[in-house]
């Protein structure tokens, strides 16, 4: 069996332990966050990324911007929906920077993104 990627480990822990346990968020909020990452994985699959090989460094600021554009163009999402998705990505990468301090700069580049 292949070893899981750092992204797979982080997103699994984030959705199952951190949001539900440590943050005690509602099931609907957790579902919204999960849906964001389902869409991100779909987008990355369309970009010919192998889902089981995605690493944290593969999700950079440029990719997030392309993802948000894809949501608008391909899925017809409004600016407010895109902001919800960006907020979920920001929250995840704030979590990642504490779990993987070596990723701090990478995470800060993503959490600095805003929609114009």
Region locations from a protein language model:
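N-terminal core-binding DNA-recognition domain of tyrosine recombinases/integrases
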Residues: 13-28, 34, 38-116
């Amino acid at each position: 069996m292949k070893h899981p990627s750092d992204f797979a480990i982080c997103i699994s822990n984030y959705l199952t332990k951190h949001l539900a346990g440590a943050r005690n968020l509602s099931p609907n909020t957790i579902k919204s966050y999960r849906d964001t990452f389902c869409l991100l994985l779909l987008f990355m699959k369309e970009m010919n990324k192998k889902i089981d090989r995605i690493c944290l460094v593969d999700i950079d600021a440029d990719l997030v911007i392309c993802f948000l554009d894809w949501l608008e163009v391909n899925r017809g999402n409004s600016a407010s929906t895109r902001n919800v998705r960006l907020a979920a990505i920001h929250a995840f990468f704030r979590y990642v920077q504490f779990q993987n301090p070596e990723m701090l700069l990478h995470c800060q580049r993503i959490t600095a993104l805003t929609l114009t």
